[in-house]
A protein has these predicted regions:
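Structured aminoacyl-transfer and RNA-binding surfaces used for tRNA recognition/handling
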Residues: 1-264
Length: 264
């Protein structure tokens, strides 16, 4: 059986989240943001949803799936210096993403879970969806995947260990690399869990290739750096399409040949 192409992986991703899970498909926003003066280029799938993360009542859908064209050539996510130096970095790439914007029903479910000492349903949902897609839809061997969790995120570790069933050696604690924010200023922040693929040998000095980052926006950071609970927690995930293609096709690097005009 031949390895799936980038187009096939895109299709499977959308079909999984839209067809099986009921997410709403949102088209890629322009690589050059039209109404965001803080960015020269769109560098992540969550960019077009910034306002929704800040106020979930603005969200037109609770669950969303996208394939976002991204460029990282400056700012917080600047991959420009790594392009050509490693096989895994590209200036222009596509990010597969799914997002959850909690509403009153989610808030009630979160409160009920907390009262019972159970983990966040939003976290459990996001982790389960990602794991199922990788191991059942793409059929990646579970034993070749490893995850990281923030050292203080006992919920995520519990979900991976006790619900998904990963052994302890496949769940690694992290620090700053497992804490997400939009930048240095005010805005939503929270822990993240990352899923890595075992390349079995070092490639550009790295044995483990990061595939998917699942961000749990749980707190709001004020301008003075103080943290408070986010009234409506959200989930933001992103997975590099090119990296998934490289894994499934067993090649070191897979830049896509179907790039579209940047300013469309």
């Amino acid at each position: 059986m031949s390895s799936p192409t980038a187009a096939e992986i895109r299709r499977r991703f959308i079909e999984y989240f839209e067809g099986r899970l009921g997410h709403e498909v949102v088209p890629s926003s322009p690589v050059v943001p039209h109404e965001d003066p803080t960015l020269l280029f769109t560098n992540a799938g969550m960019v077009q949803f910034k306002d929704w993360f800040a106020d979930t009542e603005l969200a037109s859908a609770r669950r969303v799936v996208t394939v976002q064209r991204c460029m990282r050539a400056g700012g917080k996510h600047n991959d420009l210096d790594n392009v050509g130096q490693t096989a895994r970095h590209h200036t222009l790439f596509e990010m597969l993403g799914n997002f959850s914007f909690s509403d009153a029903d989610d808030a009630a479910a979160l409160a009920a879970a907390a009262s019972k000492g159970e983990p966040s349903p939003l976290k459990a949902e996001a982790i389960s969806h990602a794991w199922t897609f990788l191991t059942e839809v793409l059929r990646l061997p579970p034993e070749k995947l490893m995850v990281t969790v923030h050292e203080d995120d006992a919920e995520a570790e519990h979900i991976w260990r006790d619900i998904i069933g990963l052994p302890a050696e496949q769940v690694v604690h992290g620090g700053e690399d497992n804490w997400w924010s939009m930048g240095a200023g005010a805005g939503p922040v929270g822990p993240c869990t990352e899923i890595f693929w075992d390349q079995e040998q070092e490639v550009d000095g790295e044995r483990w290739l990061e595939l998917w980052n699942l961000v749990f926006m749980e707190q709001l950071r004020d301008a003075d750096g103080s943290l408070s609970p986010l009234p409506r927690p959200c989930v933001d995930t992103g997975m590099g399409l090119e990296r998934v293609v490289s894994v499934l096709q067993s090649v070191r690097s897979q830049p896509l040949s179907s790039s579209q005009p940047l300013s469309s």
